[in-house]
Each structure stands twice: as C-alpha cells, then as structure tokens.
Amino acid sequence: GLGDVYKRQTGHYLKDVSNGAVQVIGADPEGSIYSDPNDVHQYQIEGVGEDFYPKAFDRSLPDEIVQVTDAEAFEMTRRLANEEGLLVGGSSGMAVFSALKYAREHDLDENQLVVVLMPDSGRSYMEKIFNDDWMRANGFADVVERTTKPSLAEQYL
C-alpha cells in the first residue's frame, strides 16, 4: 500500500542525505521468510512477517534484519507496559527488542542515535500477550514469571 511506498522512500532518502550514515534495520519474527528463507515456520507475533515476498518488499532497503522470537517480543511488550507505561502490541515489543539487540551486538554507545518505530497498540492484545493464562497456555510461563509484579495489595497489605 501507500505506507510501504513512504517507508521505502523515507529509508532511501535518509540513507542518501546522510551519505550512508543512516542504517535501516528490520525487525522480523523468527520463522518469517525475511529472516531466514530456509527456516520458515509458525510464530505468534501478529501482523508482521510473511511466508512469501510481497511485491512491495525492497530487499535493498534494510541493512540488516534482526530475528526475534515470540518469547523475546512478548517479554519486551510486557516490560514496556510495566516499566515504561507504554501499552503497545507484540510487533512494537519485537521492534524495541530488535533495536536493543542490534545496539548490543554492534557496540553502539550513548553518542549514537537509534530510532524505533512502534507500529501497534496493546489494546488488541489484552486477552493474549497481557493475559497471564493465555501466555502460560501458549508456552510462555517463564515470560509471565519475569514480567509479573506483585499488586499493591500484595506488596503493602
């Protein structure tokens, strides 16, 4: 769609005007064709990844694509809500996790700017990513344990 055109044009424009200093890093679920065409499998992060290359995909734009597991994306999504007060969805958690992973792997320091686009809201995920029972039933019990804080009543009563 039109959004894809803007993304491609913006990415190429920023690369051009920065003389190559700007890098475009894609975030994609482990199991998507973009991450590894030889290892396509099911994943639970919604609204991202594909099992085919759409016509709008411009492989020359991303400098790197960072793979993110469902557990990594969901944990970051829940942490963003708990620690930062940001109610975002799984693809946003995936984007933030991939930015942090990229920054660590490439030894970025405080003088380097990283911009993360968070493409979704968490409103649609109240019965999934933000539901402890759903998370446990889908194999993410360890994520629930790491991201669940005691209630105020449990802490003070």
Give the location of each predicted region.
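Active-site/ligand-binding loops adjacent to catalytic centers
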Residues: 14-90, 107, 129-157
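Short, small-residue-biased leader/transition segments that mark boundaries at the very start
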Residues: 1-6
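Nucleotide donor/acceptor-binding cores
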Residues: 111-113
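Short, mixed-charge aromatic SLiMs
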Residues: 118-129
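Short glycine-/acidic-enriched loop or helix-start segments at secondary-structure transitions
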Residues: 8-11, 36-37, 98-99, 126-127
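Short beta-strand segments
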Residues: 26-28, 115-119
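Buried hydrophobic packing segments
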Residues: 10, 77, 95-103
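C-terminal intrinsically disordered extensions
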Residues: 12-17, 101-104, 117
